[in-house]
């Protein structure tokens, strides 16, 4: 039973980018349950930050430190890392969670729209990781978790930029492992499946005639689990990858998808 202590996050500080709500917020809650010392999060403007702080307060989570920062701003990120070190302490765990998606057919997508997705979903994890890694190297210890996607492996209509970014993030995860594993830094990814969030609620509502939304039917048929996943189901994998229990796991993407990637589908 003593090995269960390896899953403890007691005494650790975790920075989760874009964790005002959704996946990042639920990972933060799981970290708190595992004994984390401090949660650090950022959002892109003051209004979003205040909404996030209110969510943490409502959840009864203390020891939360929120900052305004655009993770695509390299200068701003470096300044924030210095501020975190001064005000909170070392960053033991980094979760690159902030992300966006634009659902536009590729031939209709403007280059600026494509570039924005790449900047937020791929370049930003590089910027933030590069700013945090030097101090981890000095301590010879650190955990980095990149929020990847099933689109790190699969394509789908209208998400060319997102799939390109998340595929790149999978390879960035592997390369951080390759480059910094000798410093006892573990970099892994989590690839969420289809998650039941307020944003996806309209896709899961019954239609006026009582039938299921076509996309709801599609996802449940494609998923061996036969259902959408709960955001809290990402918490356990995140705690594992943030804790000493995963010290021998590096460069891996853990797909929490209910089995979609393993499933070819039922025969008609």
Please identify what each model-predicted range represents.
Residues 20-22:
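Conserved glycine-rich cofactor-binding loop
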Residues 95, 181, 186, 249-251:
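Short, small/polar-rich loop/turn modules that mediate ligand/substrate recognition or access, typified
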Residues 105-106, 113-118, 215, 219:
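Substrate-binding pocket helix/loop in short-chain dehydrogenase/reductase
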Residues 129, 165, 173:
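Active-site helix of classical SDR
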Residues 134, 178-182, 247:
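Alpha-helical segment proximal to the catalytic Tyr-Lys
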Residues 141, 227-256, 261:
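C-terminal substrate-recognition "lid" of short-chain dehydrogenase/reductases
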Residues 149:
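Residue(s) in the substrate-gating loop at a strand-loop-helix junction
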């Amino acid at each position: 039973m003593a090995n269960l202590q390896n899953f403890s996050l007691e005494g650790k500080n975790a920075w989760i980018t874009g964790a005002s709500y959704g996946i990042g917020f639920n990972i933060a809650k799981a970290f708190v349950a595992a004994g984390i010392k401090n949660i650090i999060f950022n959002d892109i403007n003051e209004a979003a930050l205040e909404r996030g702080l209110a969510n943490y307060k409502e959840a009864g989570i203390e020891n939360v430190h929120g900052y305004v920062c655009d993770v695509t701003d390299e200068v701003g990120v470096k300044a924030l890392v210095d501020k975190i070190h001064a005000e909170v302490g070392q960053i033991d765990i980094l979760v690159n969670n902030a992300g966006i998606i634009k659902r536009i057919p590729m031939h209709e997508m403007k280059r600026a729209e494509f570039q924005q997705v790449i900047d937020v979903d791929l370049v930003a994890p590089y910027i933030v990781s590069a700013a945090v890694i030097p101090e981890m190297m000095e301590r010879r210890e650190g955990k980095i978790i990149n929020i990847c996607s099933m689109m790190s492996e699969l394509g789908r209509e209208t998400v060319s930029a997102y799939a390109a970014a998340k595929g790149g993030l999978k390879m960035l995860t592997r390369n951080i492992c390759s480059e910094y594993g000798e410093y006892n830094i573990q970099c892994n990814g989590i690839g969420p499946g289809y998650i039941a969030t307020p944003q996806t609620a309209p896709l899961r509502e019954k239609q006026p005639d009582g039938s299921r939304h076509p996309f709801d039917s599609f996802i449940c048929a494609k998923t061996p689990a036969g259902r959408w996943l709960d955001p809290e189901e990402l918490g356990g994998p995140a705690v594992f990858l943030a804790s000493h229990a995963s010290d021998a796991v590096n460069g891996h993407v853990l797909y929490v998808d209910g089995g979609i990637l393993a499933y070819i589908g039922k025969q008609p």
